[in-house]
């Protein structure tokens, strides 16, 4: 009896070793294929990234814990950053950066998949083979035009979940996806990103610029002008004239001319003015 148990234990050990070798070889093969695919597109490749997944929290990201992104590819599409990476045993994700961010989240996923786990997102309805969820149903309804309907029907089945977060648009595919499906995922995330441009942008804080100062040094700000008081031009004093002060109505003496002698005004029709007193 003892030899039988010993033989069974040995067989189990050999089987476990074979499965472990196959799994390691599969992972290495996936890494080699991903690296070769990245090189063919002019992208960069690294084996893993610890901080990459901290950028997102929705979609498939809400179902994983503190994990590390594997087989990470970094590149650019039309001047915008793009990441392709694996969440081990969960999904392969493609993330495309957006020029203009939005606070409205639109989640488009195949029917039959579990609904989003977030508490701030609601079901909008079905478009063909996919269900639409959003954090703003009115904005998402405006985005679901004819182009979105066509896209929902023609998007490949390998793009199981599509969603956006702030300045990113993401697509989740099966972790067993191949090179051809990665190319389809790139095209899909670009199309979905273009369709989401109609969403309201993130409001900009401090959009109103400060009023420029006049005649003041940056290191010495001007004192605020009291209410109801206007600035006067140079040479004018801001003192109201007294009621009995008639000097304000007196003509100013002309330069180079004495007050002792005043020339009479010119005569009209050859005669002197009768009202002028010498």
Swiss-Prot record:
CDD domains per UniProt: TtfA-like
Membrane topology (Cytoplasmic): 23-278
Reported consequences of knocking out the gene: Knockdown of this gene leads to cessation of growth and shorter misshapen cells. Accummulation of trehalose monomycolate (TMM) and lack of trehalose dimycolate (TDM). Accumulates MSMEG_5308 protein.
GO biological process: cell wall organization; lipid transport
Listed Basic and acidic residues bias regions: 269-278
Coiled-coil ranges from the UniProt annotation: none
Membrane-related topology note: Single-pass membrane protein
Keywords recorded for this protein, A-Z: Cell inner membrane, Cell membrane, Cell wall biogenesis/degradation, Lipid transport, Membrane, Transmembrane, Transmembrane helix, Transport
Chief subcellular location: membrane
Keyword Cytoplasm: no
Cellular location(s): Cell inner membrane; Cell septum; Cell tip
Keyword flag Cell inner membrane: yes
Segments passing through the bilayer: 2-22
Periplasmic side stretches: 1
Region (Disordered): 200-278
Listed GO CC annotations: cell septum; cell tip; plasma membrane
Domain notes: The N-terminal domain (1-205) is necessary and sufficient for proper localization and function of this protein, and for its interaction with MmpL3.
Assembly behavior: Monomer. Interacts (via N-terminus) with MmpL3; active trehalose monomycolate (TMM) biosynthesis is not required for the complex formation. Interacts with MSMEG_5308.
Function: Required for MmpL3-dependent trehalose monomycolate (TMM) transport to the cell wall. Required for growth and cell elongation.
Name this polypeptide is given: Trehalose monomycolate transport factor A
Organism: Mycolicibacterium smegmatis (strain ATCC 700084 / mc(2)155) (Mycobacterium smegmatis)
């Amino acid at each position: 009896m003892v030899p039988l148990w010993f033989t069974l234990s040995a067989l189990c050990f050999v089987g476990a070793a074979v499965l472990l070798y196959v799994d390691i070889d599969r992972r290495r093969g996936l890494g080699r294929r991903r690296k070769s695919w990245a090189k063919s597109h002019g992208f960069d490749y690294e084996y893993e990234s610890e901080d990459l997944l901290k950028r997102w929290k929705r979609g498939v990201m809400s179902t994983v814990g503190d994990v590390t992104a594997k087989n990470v590819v970094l590149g650019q599409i039309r001047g915008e950053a793009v990441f392709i990476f694996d969440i081990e045993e969960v999904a392969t994700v493609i993330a495309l950066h957006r020029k203009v961010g939005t606070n409205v989240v639109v989640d488009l996923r195949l029917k039959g998949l579990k609904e989003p786990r977030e508490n701030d997102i609601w079901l909008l309805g079905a478009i063909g083979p996919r269900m639409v969820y959003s954090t703003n149903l009115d904005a998402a309804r405006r985005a679901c035009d004819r182009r979105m309907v066509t896209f929902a029907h023609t998007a490949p089945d390998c793009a199981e979940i599509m969603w956006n977060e702030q300045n990113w648009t993401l697509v989740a595919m099966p972790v067993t996806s191949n090179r051809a499906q990665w190319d389809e995922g790139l095209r899909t995330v670009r199309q979905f990103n273009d369709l989401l441009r109609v969403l309201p942008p993130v409001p900009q804080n401090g959009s109103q610029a400060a009023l420029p100062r006049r005649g003041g040094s940056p290191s010495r700000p001007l004192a605020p002008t009291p209410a109801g008081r206007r600035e006067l031009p140079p040479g004018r004093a801001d003192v109201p004239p007294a009621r009995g002060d008639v000097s304000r109505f007196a003509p100013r003496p002309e330069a180079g001319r004495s007050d002792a002698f005043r020339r009479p005004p010119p005569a009209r029709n050859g005669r002197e003015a009768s009202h002028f007193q010498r």
